[in-house]
């Protein structure tokens, strides 16, 4: 059987930062499949009702706002929050970011009061909406699967960002196998079962097969390099 690897922008950033030994060029890009917008949320009991409330509290006392994320500094979780604070005029590197080793642990940190906000993927929060209030997402407009989640853009913070996930094959994979799997992934996205999973996680379909996926990855490398330099991560 042909082994496959599912990758996301989080893994891709290791190469962009220069601390990874492999990039998409070392494997065979098959297809990009979904996008997951970033989200900032607070506990339901939080006094923060929107992102402006967070910014106001931070400007008054920077030590009063700690941001949880389910991965290390420089990861997608960190970048989402950093971009939001930067758009609000704050120094993104001065915001206290508390990294946890999983999204669930970051959520637990938020709910326990260890942190005041969480920066993560929207899909990560969809199953916890009875416990958290989503106060900003990085989509260009509200998404139908989470209509009550306001965008950062509509609140005056022009932050648009989407994490992606795609499939890669091993070096030497034949073109016929690559095309066959790419077609299969495209067909899967047309099924009602896929739609159920997609809607549950508020993902967006970004099917990019083969050559289109390579072009997408080339553009992502350029954009992520510029973004991480801008934020001082690299």
Per-region residue spans from a language model:
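Conserved hydrophobic/amphipathic secondary-structure segments
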Residues: 1-165
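Residue-level signal for the nucleotide or nucleotide-sugar donor/cofactor binding architecture
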Residues: 49, 105, 147, 172-177, ...
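An extracytoplasmic/periplasmic, membrane-proximal ligand-sensing/linker region
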Residues: 175-234
